Amino acid sequence: MTVRYQIEQLGDSAMMIRFGEEINEQVNGIVHAAAAYIEEQPFPGFIECIPAFTSLTVFYDMYEVYKHLPQGISSPFESVKRDVEERLAEIAEDYEVNRRIVEIPVCYGGEFGPDLEEVAKINQLSPEEVIDIHTNGEYVVYMLGFAPGFPFLGGMSKRIAAPRKSSPRPSIPAGSVGIAGLQTGVYPISTPGGWQLIGKTPLALFRPQENPPTLLRAGDIVKFVRISEKDYHAYKEESN
């Protein structure tokens, strides 16, 4: 496929590849395809790729790259740029990213989702309809950010979209599932935030003692599964 992009230098050990400005699943899919292909076909000095909504940052060891400079190229950036452009040109039309499917149990409403009724009212739906729509979707992890392991998820139905709270909460419990605009996400740690809270998961999305420390990674497919309050507490007891 023809991949359109722009490459910018970031300091002396990184570059950013921009694939557009519009946030959608097609562009984000290209970001993850590029990241996966570069990781499968690393160039000398490659360290890692960090995908975002519409861009990919590639980190490299400039000293290692310098050791392998091709004839006629004088800088590590130009060498990496050439290597990256070659790989982007090689991405096949049918190249597919190996995506994991991760199910996240959620207890909706009540003390776990204090804004569920507000989201329902905004969209002229019942709370049950909001839950049904939310659990029937498949969500792509566009990127991790804001807080350690916080997944920005694409693919949510417009039918349950809701604006951020006018006044952010000073502290949102870890595991809270929220909606902001056309996105849904899960708070991995306790932090201030302004998303509309519709439920809570007993799973720990950020586990600093483990490797990797995050449950999710960019490119994953997330499915939310409704559970009862009893099941929620059972999950918590098992994890403790």
Swiss-Prot record:
Sites binding ATP sit at 194-201
Q: Give the molecular function GO annotations.
A: 5-oxoprolinase (ATP-hydrolyzing) activity; ATP binding; protein kinase inhibitor activity
Provide the phenotype resulting from gene inactivation: Deletion of the gene enhances sporulation. Deletion mutant grows less well than wild type on minimal medium with ammonium as nitrogen source and cannot grow on 5-oxoproline. Mutant lacks 5-oxoprolinase activity and accumulates 5-oxo-L-proline.
What upregulates it? Induced by glucose when readily available sources of nitrogen, such as ammonia or glutamine, are scarce. Transcriptionally activated by TnrA and repressed by KipR.
So what family is this one in? Answer: Belongs to the PxpB family.
Please explain the role this protein plays, according to its UniProt record.
Catalyzes the cleavage of 5-oxoproline to form L-glutamate coupled to the hydrolysis of ATP to ADP and inorganic phosphate. In addition, is a potent inhibitor of the autophosphorylation reaction of kinase A (kinA) and its reverse reaction, but does not inhibit phosphate transfer to the Spo0F response regulator once kinase A is phosphorylated. Is an inhibitor of the catalytic domain of kinase A affecting the ATP/ADP reactions and not the phosphotransferase functions of this domain. The inhibition is non-competitive with respect to ATP.
Q: What is this protein called?
A: 5-oxoprolinase subunit B
Gene symbol?
A: pxpB
